[in-house]
UniProtKB/Swiss-Prot annotation:
This is HTH-type transcriptional regulator ArgP. The keyword S-adenosyl-L-methionine does not apply. It comes from Cronobacter sakazakii (strain ATCC BAA-894). Residues 21-40 bind DNA. Belongs to the LysR transcriptional regulatory family.
C-alpha cells in the first residue's frame, strides 16, 4: 500500500488553500521550487497527477482523497495529543455551511464549543446543495447539506428542516399583488436569489404557480441577511426561513404572501469518520441545538 508523506501532502494542501505556488511557498516558509518538488515527489509516489495546474490550481480526484485524509489525520492528532496541545495554536476547523444556517441557528449552536475549546473556525459559505462537495474534495472536515446520503468514510446525521416562506412588506404586496398572488402578478414582482445557481424562488413559483424558470425579474445578492433587508424596505419578495423572520412576521413588518405554501429544506450534518474528540463536540452541539430549533416532523 502506498503511504503519503505528510510533509509533501501539506505542500499540496497549501497550494490549494493559498490558490497558487507562490503564496503556498510563503505560507510554508520555503521556496516556490521546493513546493513544486514536494508535489512532484507526491505525484511520483502515487504514479498520477494530484494537481490540475490551472489558475487557481485544483486537486485531481486522487488529490481530493489525499486532502481528505490529511484533514482526518490533523483532527486525530489533536485527539491523541490531548492536553499536550494546551497553549499551542488553536485547532483549525474548516466547515462548509449554507448562508441561511449561518444567519439563523449555526453560531448559537457552536457557541458552547467556541467558549470551551481552543479552536479557530473557517466557515466556508456555500449553497446547501453544494456543501457536501467541499467535504468530498477534502476542503473541509464537516458540512451542513441537504444530501441525506453519507460519502464513503463519512458519517451523517439529520439536523432538522428550515421552512422557507414567500414574504414581502405590506407596501410591496399592495403594489404588486393588490388582488392576491397570481401567475400574472408574479411576472412583474422583483425577486432575489443568492447566486445564479440558487433556484429556490424559481422552484417555488414553478411548483405552485406553473411559472417556468427565468420568467420573473431577479436580483442576485450574496447575503442571507440582505434578503431580509430587501424585503423589509419593499424592494423584493423573497423566500426566507421562518426562523429568520419570526419577529418581522409577528410585528407585521413582513407578511406571508402565500399562507400554507412553503419550501422545506431538510438539513444533514456530514463529517469524516472516525470523529476526533473535537469533532464529536461539534457534532453533539449541532445536533442538540438543531433538534431544538429546526423542524423535526
Amino acid at each position: 500500500m502506498k503511504r503519503p508523506d505528510y510533509r509533501t501532502l501539506q505542500a499540496l494542501d497549501a497550494v490549494i488553500r493559498e490558490r497558487g505556488f507562490e503564496r503556498a511557498a510563503q505560507k510554508l516558509c520555503i521556496t516556490q521550487s521546493a513546493v513544486s518538488q514536494r508535489i512532484k515527489q507526491l505525484e511520483n509516489t502515487f504514479g498520477q497527477p494530484l494537481l490540475v495546474r490551472t489558475v487557481p490550481p485544483r486537486p485531481t480526484e486522487q488529490g481530493q482523497k489525499l486532502l481528505a485524509l490529511l484533514r482526518q489525520v490533523e483532527l486525530l492528532e489533536e485527539e491523541w495529543l490531548g492536553d499536550e496541545q494546551t497553549g499551542s495554536t488553536p485547532l483549525l476547523l474548516s466547515l462548509a455551511v449554507n448562508a441561511d444556517s449561518l444567519a439563523t441557528w449555526l453560531l448559537p449552536a457552536l457557541a458552547p464549543v467556541l467558549a470551551d475549546s481552543p479552536v479557530r473556525l473557517n466557515l466556508q459559505v456555500e449553497d446547501e446543495t453544494r456543501t457536501q462537495e467541499r467535504l468530498r474534495r477534502g476542503e473541509v472536515v464537516g458540512a451542513v447539506s441537504i444530501q441525506p446520503q453519507a460519502l464513503p468514510s463519512c458519517l451523517v446525521d439529520q439536523l432538522g428542516a428550515l421552512d422557507y416562506l414567500f414574504v414581502a412588506s405590506k407596501p410591496f404586496a399592495d403594489r404588486y399583488f393588490p388582488n392576491g398572488v397570481t401567475r400574472a402578478s408574479l411576472l412583474k414582482a422583483p425577486a432575489v436569489a443568492f447566486d445564479h445557481l440558487d433556484d429556490m424562488h424559481q422552484a417555488f413559483l414553478q411548483q405552485n404557480f406553473d411559472l417556468p424558470p427565468g420568467s420573473v425579474p431577479c436580483h442576485i445578492v450574496n447575503s442571507s441577511e440582505a434578503f431580509v433587508q430587501l424585503a423589509r424596505q419593499g424592494t423584493t419578495c423573497c423566500m426566507i426561513p421562518h426562523l429568520q423572520i419570526e419577529k418581522e412576521l409577528q410585528s407585521g413588518e413582513l407578511i406571508d404572501l402565500t399562507p400554507g405554501l412553503y419550501q422545506r429544506r431538510m438539513l444533514f450534518w456530514h463529517r469524516f469518520a472516525p470523529e476526533s474528540r473535537m469533532m464529536r463536540k461539534v457534532t453533539d452541539a449541532l445536533l442538540e441545538y438543531g433538534h431544538k430549533v429546526l423542524r423535526q416532523d
